[in-house]
Amino acid sequence: MAGAPTVSLPELRSLLASGRARLFDVRSREEAAAGTIPGALNIPVSELESALQMEPAAFQALYSAEKPKLEDEHLVFFCQMGKRGLQATQLARSLGYTGARNYAGAYREWLEKES
C-alpha cells in the first residue's frame, strides 16, 4: 500500500522473534477478540488518535501497556485487510511517531501463513 512505510510478513516475523516490534491491532474489539497476532495491543483505529496523545499514565491505566514513545523504532499497525492499518500508520506518523509502519498483509495474511 502506498502512503506509509510497510513491513512484510518475513520482516514482521524477524522483529517479533527478536522482541523489537510493538504491534498494534487497530481492528474493533470484537474482531480482535476473535483472534489476533500474539503480543498485539488492541486499540481500535477510532480511538488511536486520542490514545497516542494521552499522558503515559492514562494510557497505561486504559490499555494495561506502556505508551509508545515518539522515538520507538518498530511500531507496527495492522487490521484485517490493510486499509485501517494504513490509516493508523499515517495517523501515528502525523503525530510524530516516525517508526510507525503498516503490516500491509494484515491479519488475513497472518492467519493464512501462520495458522
Curated annotation (Swiss-Prot):
Lineage: Eukaryota, Metazoa, Chordata, Craniata, Vertebrata
EC number of this enzyme: 2.8.1.3
PROSITE patterns: RHODANESE_3
Coiled coil: none
Record protein name field: Thiosulfate:glutathione sulfurtransferase
Catalyzed reactions per annotation: thiosulfate + glutathione = S-sulfanylglutathione + sulfite + H(+); thiosulfate + 2 glutathione = glutathione disulfide + hydrogen sulfide + sulfite + 2 H(+)
Domain of life, source organism: Eukaryota
Compartments in which it is found: Cytoplasm, Perinuclear region
Rhodanese domain sequence ranges: 17-115
Pfam family, one: Rhodanese
Tissue distribution of the protein: Highly expressed in kidney, liver and skeletal muscle. Lower levels of expression in heart, colon, thymus, spleen, placenta and lung. Weakly expressed in brain, small intestine and peripheral blood leukocytes. No expression in the cell lines EFO-27 and HeLa, or the normal breast tissue cell lines MCF-10A and H184A1.
Active site: C79
Function as written in the Swiss-Prot or TrEMBL entry: Thiosulfate:glutathione sulfurtransferase (TST) required to produce S-sulfanylglutathione (GSS(-)), a central intermediate in hydrogen sulfide metabolism. Provides the link between the first step in mammalian H(2)S metabolism performed by the sulfide:quinone oxidoreductase (SQOR) which catalyzes the conversion of H(2)S to thiosulfate, and the sulfur dioxygenase (SDO) which uses GSS(-) as substrate. The thermodynamic coupling of the irreversible SDO and reversible TST reactions provides a model for the physiologically relevant reaction with thiosulfate as the sulfane donor.
Keywords linked to the UniProt accession: Cytoplasm, Transferase
One cellular-component annotation, GO: cytosol
GO terms for MF: thiosulfate-thiol sulfurtransferase activity
Originating organism: Homo sapiens
